Amino acid sequence: MIEFKDVGLVYPNGTEGLKNINVKINDGEFVVIVGLSGAGKSTFIRSINRLVTPTTGELIIDDENILNYSGNKLRMLRTKTGMIFQNYNLVKRSNVFKNVLAGRLGHTGTIRSIFNQYKKEDVALAYESLHRVNIAEKIYNRADELSGGQQQRVSIARVLTQQPKYILADEPVASLDPPTSHQVMTYLKKINREDKITTIVNLHFIDMAMEYADRIIGMRAGEVVFDGPVSEVSESTFEEIYGRSIREDDLRGGAKES
């Protein structure tokens, strides 16, 4: 379980990234965070694995306040927290398989990974992860030879290989076209259901949030302004979250692939 207790974050320049956040996320949930650019979505999600560090409050994960973590405890937190980025965050010159095996770094250690001394179980897990996102045929292609959608599937496979307890996806479809966006979200939802991995996704597109989320958290100016099940969300809810009427560019569009 993840719980924010009166969490605030002030950047060195004085900007408030988070303001008095009180949110509890239960194990196995699929939560979508929505809000305009600058609303605090990325700050919220990156605080969970301490890519940014809140300055006030407590952030409780599995009954421990992670804001006190350093050294080995912080490394262990990041090992059980898989991260998916908008820009894929792959090693472009390495092949797909090496990128996916990198998901085992937290379990294997730097020296063994440098010399590609992965256990047979790790190699088998990487193969399985590639098959689960239907990208195994590109296993020996360099990452920079792939399309954006293919690269994002590789990043999902890498996270699967990490075997995390939590998946954090920071605007994972922002750079993709509508059909590919739906494909990526479908994989994330499928993994959430099959593996019971708590999944938190930042999205701008409200139609995708409605289609894939179990629960929606709305943010504006660093504050949570809505938190509830998707069944309670309407267009007026999004207008309240965004502080304006809904525009065409707030919708991703495109049909979900069958």
From Swiss-Prot:
Keyword tags: ATP-binding, Cell membrane, Membrane, Nucleotide-binding, Phosphonate transport, Translocase, Transport
EC number: 7.3.2.2
One Gene Ontology MF term: ABC-type phosphonate transporter activity
Domain ABC transporter, residue spans: 2-246
The keyword Transcription appears for this protein: no
Top-level lineage group: Bacteria
Coarse class of the protein's main subcellular location: membrane
Catalytic activity: phosphonate(out) + ATP + H2O = phosphonate(in) + ADP + phosphate + H(+)
Root EC class: translocase
Subcellular localization(s) per the UniProt record: Cell membrane
Pfam families: ABC_tran
Recorded GO CC terms: plasma membrane
Membrane topology: Peripheral membrane protein
Binding annotation for ATP: G35, L36, S37, G38, A39, G40, K41, S42
Summary of the function given for this chain in its UniProt record: Part of the ABC transporter complex PhnCDE involved in phosphonates import. Responsible for energy coupling to the transport system.
Family listed: Belongs to the ABC transporter superfamily. Phosphonates importer (TC 3.A.1.9.1) family.
Subunit structure, interactors included: The complex is composed of two ATP-binding proteins (PhnC), two transmembrane proteins (PhnE) and a solute-binding protein (PhnD).
Protein name in the entry: Phosphonates import ATP-binding protein PhnC 1
